[in-house]
Amino acid sequence: MHLTAREQEKLLIVVAADVARRRKERGVKLNHPEAVAYITAELMEGARDGKTVAELMSEGQQYLTRDDVMEGVPEMISDVQVEATFPDGTKLVTVHNPIR
């Protein structure tokens, strides 16, 4: 199987997000890379499901709370940006202050 660099990056995000999701379910607080991967993967899946950019920008602030992550992580993540594939093409989704 041959994957492009973009496909490899998406796959890496999904794998990291899966690890983060399992840790979150066990009550383990997520670190910075895990939190970013978790939010990014949720945004990518929402786009594939047909949600709008505006919906994802709003929902993206609800995926994780301060209780889900290690101390200091919310302050480290001011924005999460992802080029997500929507039914009508690829668009940039930006979520400001995603962890509240």
UniProtKB/Swiss-Prot annotation:
This is Urease subunit gamma. One of its GO terms (cellular component) is cytoplasm. It comes from Corynebacterium urealyticum (strain ATCC 43042 / DSM 7109). The keyword RNA-binding does not apply. The gene is ureA. Belongs to the urease gamma subunit family. HAMAP family: Urease_gamma. Keywords: Cytoplasm, Hydrolase. The keyword Ribonucleoprotein does not apply. It catalyses: urea + 2 H2O + H(+) = hydrogencarbonate + 2 NH4(+).
